[in-house]
Amino acid sequence: MKLGRDRSRREFIQQSAVLGTGVILTGVGAQRLFAQGNQRPDPAKMVASKGCAARDTSGKLSPWSFERRPVGDDDILIEIKFCGICHSDIHQLRGDWGPQKYPQVPGHEIAGVVVATGKNVTRFKVGDHAGVGCMVDSCGTCDSCRHGEEQHCDNDATLFTYGYPDKTSPTGITQGGYANNLVVRERFAIQLPRTIGLQNAAPLLCAGITTYSPLVKASIKKSDKVGVAGIGGLGHLAIKLAVAKGAEVYAFTTSASKVNDIRRFGAKEVVVVDSMEKLKPYNKALDYMISTIPVNYDVAAYASLVKPYGNCTQVGMPAKGEVTINNFAFNRNRVRYSTSLIGGIPQTQEVIDYCAKNKIYPEVQVIKASEVNETWEKVINKEARYRYVIDTATI
């Protein structure tokens, strides 16, 4: 059978899709768009911006000059220095997750320097390093928000970093980090220690938190046997984070060219899955499995590697948000299958601090903005080693 992702992911896809000129607006999400507390921005105080935007479902990016909202009392203005390229950027801009409004600037792995602050801001000052991940607002009052899980806002008010309806944005939607600057509420900005380079901090704001959060929830401990399926931007960080917690990591990849790198990341064993037969020796051998595979695949084949009543967590987001599950196979395996959606703001700060303290850095390849279209194709073709990061000074 086909199993869609959790409720929050479905609502995100639905609410970021376009109906006519813009957006499918349902329930509380629609009420929020038309009843936001912030007034229309004053055009005289708009922040001039430039970025790389897609104009249609081809996803081809080109230069675009646009405006962001003024810096409000609770906002900071970040001069973006680096922005990571996530496979989600490609899925969304090409319409894999539903129709989109264009022009749209992607990017939710944003690292830069604070250049202005609103009068109520207390956590940042000009010159501080700051980052922004996958969301820029939520209701702030529901149980999920109050417990630091803003990505699961009970009032459907999570405002994702790009392509989401936003009355305060001069373009009508949030615009992401393939750009030279960003205005964001202080509460949704992450403090970046100067002990970690901005190019290394950027991928942690999505790839890092997306893998860190389920590992923490699974209470991974020393000597646990942890499987990581799909070794790309997310998977290589999952390996490093699990190893840092003392786990024995078993990595599963379809790319033989990555074997030496994966061993360097700390994996105990690397399995090149060129046929499903390669999985059989590991049947019921693992304590936990995290899958970062971003395409539809046979979940049960990988989940069968986990011990009975163990856990398998899906964090990769396939096109249309669907993966294939064989219910008969799961009945036999007795494995608990779950999904995980990024992580809340407190936990995002936690993973940044944890990685800075333990010197856990992503493997990055810095590119110019002019190379972004060809780089997207490299991501699709599994050529990334292991996270491309845009030097936004080249925009």
Q: What positions do the PLM features span?
A:
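C-terminal hydrophobic helical "lid"/dimerization subdomain
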Residues: 2-7, 11-31, 37-47, 300, ...
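C-terminal segment of N-terminal export signals and the immediately downstream linker at the start
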Residues: 28-70, 79, 330
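Glycine-rich phosphate-binding loop and adjacent beta-alpha segment
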Residues: 35, 293-363, 392-395
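Glycine-rich beta-strand-centered segment in the early N-terminal region that forms part
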Residues: 43, 69-83, 96-146, 151, ...
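NAD(P)H dinucleotide-binding glycine-rich loop of Rossmann-like/cofactor-binding domains
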Residues: 139-229
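Adenosine-nucleotide cofactor-binding segment
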Residues: 222, 228-231, 241-299
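Hydrophobic/small residue at the entry helix of a nucleotide-binding pocket
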Residues: 234
